[in-house]
Design a protein with these regions (language model features):
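C-terminal alpha-helical "lid" subdomain
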Residues: 2-16, 39-48, 149, 166-226
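Walker A/P-loop nucleotide-binding motif
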Residues: 25-47
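Conserved catalytic segments around the Walker B and adjacent sensor/switch elements
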Residues: 32, 50-63
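Sensor-1/coupling segment of RecA-like P-loop NTPase cores
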Residues: 32-38, 124-148
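Conserved NTP-binding/hydrolysis module of P-loop NTPases
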Residues: 54-55, 66-83
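A short helix-turn-beta junction within AAA+ P-loop NTPase domains corresponding to the substrate/partner-engaging
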Residues: 55, 145-162
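Conserved AAA+ ATPase "SRH/arginine-finger" region at the nucleotide-binding site
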Residues: 60-62, 138, 155-168
Length: 226
């Protein structure tokens, strides 16, 4: 299987969100939300974009406090966390003013019930004018709407949708070293619509094809295997 980052429609929408936030005037809020069901490639895309744009990628976790969150941001800036949370916060603000960077906060659902952490991210945004992008699950938008004063700052929102047949064809053509016929991809599309599932399926079918000397995967073969 080829190691290629496939730019599906979801990925292109995520890229568009990032570029739109970067290009907004100073007086326009630069917070964004990317949300959707699990397994659609949100985290992989956020990590890829953080590398592409020299951003800061933070993965929130259960029980994460605002202190812990700020310390993680400080570490991602290649700084040693200070003892006082206020000192760490000032380091983050100072560094971002010197060198503006996008902050990606993945698994944001873990922080949605932690008002202080959400407020901390808002304060970082307001003091630095740096884009901050929340990445969350299917209910993230609804949870975010509870914070009315914060929700107004989200000028860009993208929902990751399940794959269309065109997305699936693109994924198979770019990742698989064994060709798949169009009707075989249509059959797979009816059964699989999560990126993780599809990658695992490609790996499995490539192995079977190589072991059996198959030069392509057809509809008849897929029906027997999937």
């Amino acid at each position: 299987m080829r190691k290629i980052f496939v730019k599906t429609n979801n990925v292109r929408n995520f890229i568009g969100l990032v570029e739109n936030l970067q290009n907004k005037p100073k007086n326009i809020p630069k917070m964004g939300l990317v949300y959707g069901e699990p397994g659609l490639g949100k985290s992989q895309t956020a990590l890829w974009l953080a590398c592409k744009y020299d951003g800061i990628y933070i993965r929130a976790s259960n029980l994460m406090t605002s202190r812990w969150l700020v310390e993680e941001i400080v570490r991602e800036m290649d700084e040693l966390p200070r003892y006082l949370t206020s000192d760490n916060f000032n380091v983050v603000i100072s560094k971002l003013i010197q060198k503006p960077r996008i902050i990606f906060v993945d698994e944001i659902d873990y922080l949605m019930n932690n008002y202080k952490s959400i407020e901390t991210l808002r304060d970082i945004h307001d003091k630095t004018d740096c884009p901050i992008i929340f990445v969350g699950m299917g209910l993230a938008l609804r949870k975010l709407e509870r914070y009315k004063h914060l929700y107004d700052r989200f000028s860009e929102i993208v929902k990751f949708e399940t794959f269309e047949i065109e997305d699936l064809s693109q994924i198979f053509s770019q990742l698989s070293e064994i060709p798949f016929t169009p009707d075989s991809i249509e059959y797979i599309h009816k059964k699989y619509n999560r990126f993780r599932q599809i990658v695992q399926l490609i790996s499995k079918l490539e192995t079977i094809a190589k072991e059996n000397g198959l030069t392509e995967i057809t509809f008849e073969i897929i029906k027997e295997l999937v």
